[in-house]
Regions:
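N-terminal secretory signal peptides that target proteins for export/translocation
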Residues: 1-7
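Bacterial N-terminal signal peptides
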Residues: 11-24
Length: 168
């Protein structure tokens, strides 16, 4: 019995360690986009993030999927790669300061201009749609790249600006 369980525990531990290392050594979006004046990577737009991406973390996707925020809040996830600010009691959205902190945290999980290398897009995407296999403990939030919320996150990763964002 133990011989069957031990490999699973070791495998889960290695996966967790790899995720932490990827996060720890991932350059921030600012570092990636400002390291050279002629960098081709787009800047991540805070206003687009706040208006179109951040609400996705609070959105209930379906009866069998919890909101991202349920697991990815600082009190629950405590320092993991996607640790969102705690909402104030009774609040339905983050304050400006909290949103800016979330932007900084979430930006570390994307490679501006490269959705295929952005963990924020690949981890919650179903493996058959191009997501990473067995990496997101909370289930697959996106069945395909055609999901409107997935497309909003991709647009942000690609440098979409709030002023140019299409209407819902």
């Amino acid at each position: 019995m133990i011989s069957r369980i031990l490999p699973k525990i070791v495998s889960a531990g290695l996966l967790l360690a790899a995720s932490v290392l990827m996060y720890a050594f991932a350059p921030s979006a600012t570092a990636q986009t400002s390291s050279s004046p002629d960098a081709k990577a787009p800047q991540l737009d805070y206003e687009f993030f706040k208006a179109r991406v951040e609400p996705i973390f609070l959105k209930r996707r379906s009866a069998d999927h919890a909101r991202c925020y349920v697991c990815h809040q600082m009190a629950h996830h405590g320092g993991g790669p996607l640790s969102l600010e705690m909402l104030s009691p009774g609040a339905t959205f983050w304050t400006e300061e909290q949103s800016r902190s979330n932007f900084k945290t979430v930006s570390k999980l994307v490679v501006p201009g490269d959705p295929d290398s952005s963990l924020l897009l690949r981890m919650p995407l179903a493996p058959e749609a191009g997501g990473l296999a067995d990496t997101h403990q909370g289930g697959r939030q996106f069945a395909s790249e055609d999901d409107p919320d997935w497309k909003n996150i991709k647009a942000w990763v690609m440098g979409q600006k709030a002023a140019a964002s299409p209407a819902h």
